[in-house]
Amino acid sequence: MSQKWVYKFTEGNANMRNLLGGKGANLAEMTNLGLPIPQGFTVTTEACTDYYNSGKKITEEIQGQIFDALKWLEAEQGKQFGDVNDPLLVSVRSGARASMPGMMDTILNLGLNDISVEGFAKKTGNPRFAYDSYRRFIQMFSDVVMEVPKSFFEKIIDELKEEKGVHFDTELTAEDLKELIGRFKKIYSENMDGAEFPQDPRVQLMEAVKAVFRSWDNPRAIVYRRMNDIPGDWGTAVNVQAMVFGNMGDTSGTGVAFTRNPSTGAKGIFGEYLINAQGEDVVAGVRTPQPISRLAEDMPECYAQFMELAMKLENHYRDMQDMEFTIQEGKLYFLQTRNGKRTAQAALQIACDLVDEGKITPQEAVLRIEAKSLDQLLHPTFDPEALKSGEVIGSALPASPGAAAGRVYFSADEAKMAHMRGDRVILVRLETSPEDIEGMHASEGILTVRGGMTSHAAVVARGMGTCCVSGCGEIKIDEEAKVFSLGGYTFHEGDYISLDGSTGKIYKGDIKTVEASVSGNFGRIMMWADKFRKLQVRTNADTPADTENAVKLGAEGIGLCRTEHMFFDPERIPKIRKMILSDTQEAREAALMELLPYQKEDFKAMYKALKGRPMTIRYLDPPLHEFVPTEEADIEALAKDMGLTKEQVQQKCNELHEFNPMMGHRGCRLAVTFPEIAKMQTRAVIEAAIEVKEECDYDIVPEIMIPLVGDKKELKFVKTVVDDTAKQVMDEKKIYINYHVGTMIEIPRAALLADEIAEEAEFFSFGTNDLTQMTFGFSRDDAGKFLSSYYESKIYESDPFAKLDQNGVGKLVKMAAEKGRATRKDLKLGICGEHGGDPSSVEFCHQVGLNYVSCSPFRVPIARLAAAQAALKEQA
């Protein structure tokens, strides 16, 4: 029996998502529920994988199954594909397993040609509608399938409207549209080396299926997948569906609706529609639509039926639904439903409401929230004082919440470049398209002239947590000249504007923003998450302010305090430079004694902010050359302070130069060559702990972490210095406290010898930033130059510095954990690289059995939620 590559909607269900894609599985499920669905069939994701494996060809077997399904659809609809009197027309849409809005391309009205369009005009008795459908098909097919730029066609439409003296597409007559079709076909031919527009509907269909498969690998899809951790080998399914028409006159229309508000989560239908339009007009945001409540006046029966079925869908899926619908001459059809994309704020509101309504459990609520999206909750709002003097120059649709201020840029590329220069960017576009994804990602905010709350800009911005205001029709924009005018002002590239994505207001100038405060739903979801998770979550912090912030966000301690960051203060850096450039141990010790009070006060402030929570203190790690002066004035000041000549200081600085400093004289190697550094740091740690215990009665157990260890003897050497100094301090103070000495596992050799190192270390913390660098053999600072080529060539799927490489680096982590605990059963294990705040890496840490993850303060909620999700998935 040959493999089944094609499924009718009547043959699938919601559980077949991996095979049929999200859209195909939902269309099958809606068919099973008895909803009014235009019938059709799905070409599976496996067929997409086969297409790539077969050298980008569709095999005869798959093509045969597509044509068999087409025969069934013809019988079902009572129409023939390519018929000259009453042709069957279909839409061809992509549908991957994971929702990827605007990443894949849609083709409508497929099956029309020069002859069948006349039969279609006769059958419908509506020539204008028939020719409008044909011109749309030529335009979409040329753009999506043959890559003839859409702008070529838009330009011709504008020229024709000018010639005919009309403003809107809808004012063009059937004769005008015939003329337009002729011009469109000419453009097609000119761009396709003289080839004519294909007239055989079967050729059209197979080309369209191939185009959807190809679009799985277009640059914007690759970028979206990398940003959202979607594997490249999943492939996309293709849905072929009988057409229904929303552009057959005033009793037809098309719309997009959500069963709850996707920005706030408020209960109640939220959406919009256009009378006499096709679906892509709403989604692409080409015309600005009406709110869904108006449908009750325009078509009350359709509205009542729609409301009933929308609630049926939400109750069935037990989640907020995003639905596309078309009304053809008074009859309602659903074209798709899916769990709606939503802001983080809305996700929390909806999850809590669904628990209160008894539709889902707290466990399900926790699993439903995308951990990464919590980032959005910590988004800025405008400073209330600054806002008082803000001048509103316009307002439009509040498409994605948050406040943003920045310089205006008019293209995605310019936005990206400006962002790389360090500018805050507001991307201003007539409308955004999927090609703009990287520019949108680089922007603080997005402002569009066209498009509604469900346009491409709105959906993508909400998904990324970027502030967006859409559909500001008052703007007069010239993207070529890089200028727009609004509210009586003219803005050029580089001028400042501010946007409020929660109200839709647009302000002149650069208004100060402030960090967000989180709401009650956040606390509720976090309370559930904390109940379910096993992993502890700590933070990486070097200042009391960072520490307080992280504790507010739920951090249970500090997993990495980088002591060197405390030395970069302008008051302190001369003292560390003096220590570095001193020739004798005595001079070094004298300089270190000047630093001791600063370091001790810092630790005291951190301990107080932590109120007894644990803190892991990493001893001095960076290469010494990072501290030496480079500015002329600093060199002179240091020379004067040390009683040396400028030339002597310069020479000493030059001697510290290393060819490969990241693998040079740093980490524990500093403590081996200059034990006095470790002595000073130990004295500061222990004295601070004793004094805070006396002042605040906190029971502090310092965790002292020695970095860059590659050998047990290395650790033993530094640990002896620490133990001797700690004993000396405690003897002086006559107060004795517990402390632990551990190490960072960041050199592959340390992972290989973890069983030996655990004889000395009381805890391991995986420094996955350096462990990744040393395992891959490339530097974090330089890898960006070539990694993009690796993504394009599908060598790597994601940035190994952002998402832990479980195949390589992960194996070292797992091995070190197992070997370490074989030696010391109670060995505490944590991770303190940037990976500590990445959800998939947190899940890995849970599986390997680490005790905690540590991440930057604002990622603490993400890690808490990801840890709970990992525990719940394991139970399931």
Question: Where is each model-derived feature located?
Answer:
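Conserved alpha/beta-domain cores
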Residues: 93-94, 518, 528-876
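Residues forming the flavin
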Residues: 464-466
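A short, small-residue-rich loop immediately preceding and capping a beta-strand
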Residues: 444-450, 468, 830
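Short beta->alpha connector loops at strand-helix junctions that form conserved
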Residues: 41, 449-451, 470-473, 561, ...
